Amino acid sequence: MRAKDHNRSIDADWLSRAFCYEDSVVKPLRYFCLALALLPCMAHAAPELNVGGLYDYLEEGKSTLLKRVRNGGDSTAFVKVSVVELVYDGSAAPREVPLDGLALEQRGLVVSPARLIVPARGMQAVRLLYRGERDKERYYRLRFIPVLPELGDGFAVSEAEAEQYRDSLKAGVNLLAGYGTLLFVRPDQTRYETPIRRQGGALTVTNQGNATVVLDHFRQCQAQDQVCEPATKHHLLPGRTRKFEGQAAKVHQFELQEGSERKAMVLEG
């Protein structure tokens, strides 16, 4: 199914670009820190991060969110957390505004701690605190990047400990994988209004509210829950319209998510 983009709507393609480490990497945002290959016969202990969901939503009236970072590997993970604000001003791609170099009082979103030491088979948590204005919806990208610790880089390890850790990873061909997640900060007085129209097989969805809506498990089927295409997920920002082509003999089926509300949608015509 081919989708036409109207008014530069934000969808999974935009989110892929927003998450990319180098504007060409798509989910799950693998970041090669040491090597390009991992040979099973040469594999040694290495960290394996799991940051949970790639999308988080800070609803109206809430200012904090706890995000858990798990390490399923056999080696301790030293993780740096970086934050950029994604400013969508009508261009083809969002503009990135780094927050890491700003003074604490100038940051709309504060991540604490910004350095994590996650033990093997263990878990640590980061606290997201939003302190900025909520006159409109705002968007932030967080990067969780495993690194080789160095003296004085905030991990409070000695030079000998850092060298020992580096040597343990260099013993084989290892891969350190980093991940990016996206945070949606809802505005005050959040309002949802999402008219949906289907005609001649084409589905048109418009977001007339002031917060992003999600079309989850989106697919076209021969009939409800029968012979369906692979499901996709689309985020539609306020003021945007998205048109999906389709066949009149088939149905569009998805879950419309407006904040905490969920609506099962099956559309014909």
Which sequence ranges carry the predicted segments?
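Beta-sheet-dominated interaction scaffolds and their linkers
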Residues: 46-75, 189-198, 233
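Short acidic, flexible loop segments centered on an aromatic residue
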Residues: 79-103, 145, 210-225
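Bacterial N-terminal signal peptides that target proteins for export
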Residues: 15, 20-33
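Intrinsically disordered, low-complexity segments enriched in serine, threonine, and glycine
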Residues: 193, 197-269
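Asparagine-centered strand-capping/turn motif at beta-strand->loop junctions
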Residues: 69-73, 130, 203-211
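N-terminal signal peptide c-region/cleavage motif recognized by signal peptidases
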Residues: 40-42
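Terminal connector regions
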Residues: 131-190, 252-269
